[in-house]
């Protein structure tokens, strides 16, 4: 946990799914992961990311040039009854992923597995801020330089139909 100016104490997990992610429960922020809150979710996500990078050192065990949290994944209860959780991933200079984020889903699967909340070959469905979903599973556990890691499989497809009522 860290202290973030204007937000207070924030609890989070750091996980790797291609980049380092900070995973933050939206409930502690008093927010919902919803497209109507996108601007505020981005603002808060960047504050959290920047404070983490000022106070916590992360380094990939095989690639020391990967040494910062690049993305903040804010997760929430799903609105889709088939999904397990819902998220928005904030990155860059204020962008967010409209999909559940492939690398973010990997990071979430690794965190859930490490906490004993999902087992080998159990399906996990992640809903995005726009309502799209990704499915993933932990296939096996491995070691990466003596650090527990997972191998996962993910399958997904997208259907987009633009309309004035959908962001």
Model-assigned labels for residue ranges:
Residues 1-167:
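Active-site proximal loop and beta-alpha junction motif in alpha/beta enzyme cores
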């Amino acid at each position: 946990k860290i202290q973030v100016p204007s937000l207070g104490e924030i609890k989070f997990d750091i996980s790797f799914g291609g980049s380092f992610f900070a995973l933050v429960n939206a409930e502690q922020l008093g927010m919902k992961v919803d497209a109507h809150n996108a601007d505020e979710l981005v603002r808060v996500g960047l504050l959290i990311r920047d404070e983490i990078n000022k106070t916590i050192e992360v380094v990939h065990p095989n690639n020391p040039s990967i040494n910062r949290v690049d993305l903040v994944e804010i997760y929430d209860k799903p609105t889709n009854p088939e999904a397990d959780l819902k998220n928005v991933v904030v990155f860059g200079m204020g962008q967010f992923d409209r999909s559940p984020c492939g690398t973010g889903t990997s990071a979430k699967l690794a965190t859930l597995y490490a906490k004993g909340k999902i087992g080998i070959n159990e399906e996990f469905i992640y809903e995005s801020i726009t309502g799209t979903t990704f499915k993933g599973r932990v296939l096996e556990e491995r070691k990466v330089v003596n650090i527990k890691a997972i191998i996962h499989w993910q399958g997904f497809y997208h259907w987009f139909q633009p309309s004035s009522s959908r962001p």
